[in-house]
Amino acid sequence: MLAVCYRFAHNREDAEDMLQEGFIKVFSQMHTFQNKGAFEGWIRRIIVHTCINNLKKNKRFNESLDIVHAHGVQVREESVPSIVQAKQIVECIRILPIGYRTVLNLYAIEGYSHKEIADMLDIEESTSRSQYTRAKQMLEEILIRKKILTKPKEKTEWLVAVR
């Protein structure tokens, strides 16, 4: 779960704070778990919501939204062939502005729909879609600049959300 928090946090200390706050919520809400679905999924949902609430509370999300462990991410082998590069991609995702990073994480990695993201972040569904598109574009530019990804000859979708 620390990896989940780390994707949303600015640094390890913030991630640890989010995780601690999330587990406090998990333990205080334990009586509400109804054995419908996986226990880990229930915990993950609480942790993700805790991270989102933390970003909102600290106004980090809204500020960056105004400016323009990668599990769940599939990278096409012909574009990015190595595990080392996959780790580099995760680090490049952390470079994205928090708004872009948050939407990218929620949609492509956590598997939320744009409607769910819009509800969680109090934004329009179209904003979620555009933030996701911009995040992918910015991430691709960063990866090309860092020579992790070669510029494709034709438009390809190399980052695909796993559903």
Predicted regions and their residues:
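Sigma70-family region 2
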Residues: 7-10, 21-38, 57-59
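Arg/Lys-rich amphipathic alpha helix in sigma70-family domain 2
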Residues: 31-35, 45-65, 82, 134
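Short, charged helix-capping/linker segments at alpha-helix termini
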Residues: 2-21, 148-150
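C-terminal edge and immediately downstream basic/flexible tail or linker adjoining helix-turn-helix-like DNA-binding
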Residues: 63, 119-120, 136-163
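A short pre-motif secondary-structure segment
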Residues: 103-107
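Helix-turn-helix DNA-binding motif, specifically the short coil turn and the N-cap/start of the second
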Residues: 11, 113, 122-127
